[in-house]
Amino acid sequence: MGKRWLPSLALLPLPPPLLLLLLLLLPTNASAPQKPIYMVMVPSLLHAGTPEKGCLLFNHLNETVTVKVSMESVRGNQSLFTDLVVDKDLFHCASFIVPQSSSNEVMFLTVQVKGPTHEFRRRSTVLIKTKESLVFAQTDKPIYKPGQMVRFRVVSLDENFHPLNELIPLLYIQDSKKNRIAQWQNFRLEGGLKQLSFPLSSEPTQGSYKVVIRTESGRTVEHPFSVKEFVLPKFEVKVAVPETITILEEEMNVSVCGIYTYGKPVPGHVTVNICRKYSNPSSCFGEESLAFCEKFSQQLDGRGCFSQLVKTKSFQLKRQEYEMQLDVNAKIQEEGTGVEETGKGLTKITRTITKLSFVNVDTHFRQGIPFVGQVLLVDGRGTPIPYEMIFIGADEANQNINTTTDKNGLARFSINTDDIMGTSLTVRAKYKDSNVCYGFRWLTEENVEAWHTANAVFSPSRSFVHLESLPYKLRCEQTLAVQAHYILNDEAVLERKELVFYYLMMAKGGIVRAGTHVLPVTQGHKKGHFSILISMETDLAPVARLVLYTILPNGEVVGDTVKYEIEKCLANKVDLVFHPNIGLPATRAFLSVMASPQSLCGLRAVDQSVLLTKPEAELSASLVYDLLPVKDLTGFPKGVNQQEEDTNGCLKQNDTYINGILYSPVQNTNEEDMYGFLKDMGLKVFTNLNIRKPKVCERLGVNKIPAAYHLVSQGHMDAFLESSESPTETTRSYFPETWIWDLVIVDSTGVAEMEVTVPDTITEWKAGAFCLSNDTGLGLSPVIDFQAFQPFFVDLTMPYSVIRGEAFTLKATVLNYLQTCIRVGVQLEASPDFLATPEEKEQKSHCICMNERHTMSWAVIPKSLGNVNFTVSAEALDSKELCRNEVPVVPERGKKDTIIKSLLVEPEGLENEVTFNSLLCPTGAEVSEQISLKLPSDVVEESARASVTVLGDILGSAMQNTQDLLKMPYGCGEQNMVLFAPNIYVLDYLNETEQLTQEIKTKAITYLNTGYQRQLNYKHRDGSYSTFGDKPGRSHANTWLTAFVLKSFAQARRYIFIDESHITQALTWLSQQQKDNGCFRSSGSLLNNAMKGGVEDEVTLSAYITIALLEMSLPVTHPVVRNALFCLDTAWKSARRGASGNHVYTKALLAYAFALAGNQDTKKEILKSLDEEAVKEDNSVHWTRAQKPRVPADLWYQPQAPSAEVEMTAYVLLAYLTTELVPTREDLTAAMLIVKWLTKQQNSHGGFSSTQDTVVALHALSKYGAATFTRAKKAAHVTIQSSGAFYTKFQVNNDNQLLLQRVTLPTVPGDYTAKVAGEGCVYLQTSLKYSVLPREKEFPFALVVQTLPGTCEDLKAHTTFQISLNISYIGSRSDSNMAIADVKMVSGFIPLKPTVKMLERSVHVSRTEVSNNHVLIYLDKVSNQMLTLFFMVQQDIPVRDLKPAIVKVYDYYEKDEFAVAKYSAPCSAGYGNA
């Protein structure tokens, strides 16, 4: 009703005479002649640049009119429709495109209809949003291990899910510390997608990573993945418990099953713990105050399961102060291996015994049309309760009814609305009364009632339309018959023979369908129903809203709206099929993809074990639909929600007296009018019809009741506007985590087929595909399974390594998963490399039945050194001999399984390596070099081996080994840089000499990317870097390392992405360390104390930093550089006057710094001074330190030069080669003599002694190589021959000069001759390796190694013991540089990692690593004070006749300073567990 009268003193019922008075007051046009009708509907939210629809309705036109629709903004007016001519009745929906906009803005939309005698103009606001694409990313798996390749796809779609070849301005990878570690810019998608990849470093920051995509519109899209060290689970622990129990339940069933990833049951033992925790736990009052717990433990049954009916009494379900849930934790230990996996379950506790809720009930009622609906009765678990009586009450309708639930727990009701006089209807549903018993801290059961309130629909003529809603989600491609009920007032319809009903459908925020329905009207039949057929297609998903309305002759608009949920379907129907869907490892299978013709499909198949480790949100239609900017437009967006102009005016407030009581009209806010229905659909209406209920005029001086304009979903729309919604015989060795990651194009028939090889992992693979078509858009396949399975297979158990002379037990376990018994023959292939003896009486075959396993063992004694292969085959035999009263079968496929594993057999003692290098350059005549291989007297028998490598480039060996330049650990911030920086010099050199191949470039850039990621682990928040990163208590930033990283990152920018902020922050931090005199203050410890020597520490460090700043191409005029050069200039002038010491290391740095600064005079002056101190011998030049560690007297070969001497000599070489133009002949002559000495110091991997000398020397050699590079006209011929029969020949030419050519020398010791003839220089490198037994002698370190217990008396000593190290420095210096303690494990034992990690709590231990069978302990320095370290080890594999293991402590920068000691396991004789 338009008005409602309220007494001013008290609320009274509305008297009948007043109802007539109210109806007379309402406006009516029943007798008025028909006038032209104009109605235009447009969504209140429009998207720029995309097709939108507006619907026009013109009726009763008596003249031709023109229609104009335009938009107004601060930027001017823009026409959508211009001079559209209409000369007859019209209902039409027209498409238009809103011009592009740079940002979201509210605009005015004006509709103007003009004729000769009539003119209509309305103006309202709409929100224009910029066009948004739907962008998402997909990774090949959700979690990665360090060092793995991350592969991902970027996909872009329009709002109809069709592919967009969008330009992506920026995409980057962000690690868990918010560092950008990889970046791509300005690339365009092809076919709607792009496939990219990048490698993780071997030591990345672990945690949550993101693929971050910046779209053209500026929106940011993120896709998460994890980086973590993990071991794929062998099996899954599934815990099945009730989702909910009530406080009245006395027992619950708990079930736990262990299932292998290939679907078979796990044999083993299960432990289940069920707890109800206290809400506010305290350790002060015992375990009972923390939780009520029950524990169960037993063997799994044949199905791999355990089931228990658990009494709930012990969990005190009615106690209030405990959590309303039971936590179930299960642990299964696999039989035989002891491998453990866990699973969890959760059961909620509820006091709700029964609950009623209304289902499919309208929010409005219409007088005269029954109000129908349903209520659902469920128990506390949510299970429907059938055949129970429900009470339904509606006071406003004066109705109380009883109804019974059906088998689905639903009860239907219908309420007669004829006599409802008010504007709201409240319906109550009740099942049982709740227990009204209250107790402190006790819970009582509850039966939840349901209440529903519906508001009246306003109609002055009492004419209504009602659309039936549906309680379920509609399927795509079905046809829906929408049921429309109507009741029409005779006076309103007049003499009309028919009424036209108009309908619109909205989805995704836009008008998508429109139509009409003509209803014949006969006298006396003004109440009834009809249906409209609507086809459910993808354009309507996921939510469709329908408005149906008619215009009565009196101008009243009568209608209703309804909302339908539609399944999230996609037009491109994709299917994926494996043929077959089960297969043996290494066999072939076919994968078929069915989709719309010419679709581009992305395929993925992932090991189920990966998904168990890290579940992920599956790429689904739901996920894609969630990307839509608008899924369901309701109400008006923010900024468009102001109350619009009402042209109908208002009703005056005329008080009236009835029976002496004063009544005053007030606005009724409960009734819904047609304007409200259309607004709820997000439609703006421009019309000359009256679609609003009358408004009561406001009156001054009277307390006003504010009108509340209902908006169903305004809060949702505001949130939407403020946020951007935006995986026969077999020999198994290939075990990937992602099997398939491919793009395929479907052919014209809609099919693509690819042949794939099944990996060797026995598991279940989860495969899926998405496809993109220009015609039908996106499609997604269901996830399908492929079972990689071996009906039976064999697995080996063996140690990682043994020492020659030790014996171990090799175990082969055969598992049978066939449904029948098999007779299996197991054979260990004989080899001259080991001696194997069966440990049990040898049988030709073994009977193994379903789900059983059998283990065979051999006592093995290795006879050869190096990697020894063990090949074991298990074959199902055709045998008449019965297995448990049945004939064993032979499977048709997979009747034989072979596995190959290798064992490292190491010589006794400690391995040494000696390298002899020569640079031979024949100039017309043949040149030769004698190679004499000698061994010390204490060499371990058969441990010696030697090889010769021939290269045509002095950097050739380094290029082949850029990630293995040093046979040393790389676990700190400085050492990591030796994996990073040389790649820059290699790329620069090859670029300059035009030798760079795509293969080398790809490899070097990969190493740069991974090195970059690793180095960020050592970054501090202020932009500086330290040796072991920002660790609590050890977070002193290191000035020297920060400068090293800064210049390396700056130089790497030309090859890889480096986040500019890292460079800016490091430079800012360094500038803050600069003192007033231009020098830099030292921060953090210098791990190499060669930089600490002499009084010139500050100058040495300042020279290094200045070099770094100049190498990153900062100009000499830069304030920091200018002041730094002032510091160096002052220092050199002081040194020249003899005011300070004369440190060679410092002078070498100064010479290079002044060379970079372009100060050639000072450079020459320093080089002249250095030349006077040079060591000139063997036609080479180098420099040495005044103080250096003593070389052991018993060495029988020339040792490799110390790190500091290589480094300072390389700096002098760089100074000679750094000139304004090109180096002079004199410079190159001097450089050649230095290069001859430097190349002799290289190790067999192309590196030098340590990290910094390797980086500087390779930089210098690459610069020299580029300056002297020429292409030889003839090849160089190299011959290597012995005094005996050995002879081999190599050729080095322009095509293979980067190729590493190597030959093994047959006899050690022995004498060989190398001869080179032809043109060009040849780099010859001989590597000799051998082992020696440690012997008592004087070392620079004191090292004592002990075990606890020391003897085998303690039974636990067979399987676990403690290793204790006592270390001190007793050399020529006050303390050592950074040192490494390398503890090799006794064969068959592994370290307990938590006890190793605890070593890092020691003040001098910076880092620990477990690498293969070694424990590495990083010590920042070792002094003369004894340092004691200890950790635990435990037996992994039994080994007999254990040999002692070696512990070595060495100075990282002075490798000739070391100490070795050996230790034995307490139980060394016989088996370790005997």
Swiss-Prot record:
Glycosylation positions in this chain: 62, 77, 253, 402, 654, 774, 869, 991, 1366
Source organism superkingdom: Eukaryota
Gene Ontology biological process terms in this record: female pregnancy; negative regulation of complement activation, lectin pathway; stem cell differentiation
Role this protein plays: Is able to inhibit all four classes of proteinases by a unique 'trapping' mechanism. This protein has a peptide stretch, called the 'bait region' which contains specific cleavage sites for different proteinases. When a proteinase cleaves the bait region, a conformational change is induced in the protein which traps the proteinase. The entrapped enzyme remains active against low molecular weight substrates (activity against high molecular weight substrates is greatly reduced).
Keyword RNA-binding applies: no
One Pfam family of this chain: A2M_BRD
Signal sequence, renumbered to the chain: 1-32
InterPro entries referenced in this protein's UniProt entry, alphabetically: A-macroglobulin_rcpt-bd, A-macroglobulin_rcpt-bd_sf, A2M/Complement_sys, A2M_N_BRD, A2M_TED, Alpha-macroglob_thiol-ester_cl, Alpha-macroglobulin_TED, Ig-like_fold
SUPFAM superfamilies xrefs: Alpha-macroglobulin receptor domain, E set domains, Terpenoid cyclases/Protein prenyltransferases
Annotated GO CC locations: extracellular space
Cross-link position per record: Isoglutamyl cysteine thioester (Cys-Gln): 972-975
Gene Ontology molecular-function annotations: calcium-dependent protein binding; interleukin-1 binding; interleukin-8 binding; peptidase inhibitor activity; protease binding; serine-type endopeptidase inhibitor activity; signaling receptor binding; tumor necrosis factor binding
Tissue-by-tissue expression: Expressed in uterus, mesometrial lymphoid aggregate and mammary tissue during pregnancy. Expressed in ovary, testis and kidney. Low level expression in heart. Not expressed in liver.
Protein's name according to its UniProt entry: Alpha-2-macroglobulin-P
Assembly, per entry: Homotetramer; disulfide-linked.
Organism in which the protein naturally occurs: Mus musculus
Family: Belongs to the protease inhibitor I39 (alpha-2-macroglobulin) family.
Cystine crosslinks: 55-93, 257-305, 275-293, 476-569, 601-771, 650-697, 821-849, 847-883, 921-1321, 1079-1127, 1352-1467
Gene expressing this chain: A2m
Localization in the cell: Secreted
Coiled coil: none
Keywords: Bait region, Disulfide bond, Glycoprotein, Pregnancy, Protease inhibitor, Secreted, Serine protease inhibitor, Signal, Thioester bond
Region: Bait region, residue numbers: 623-752
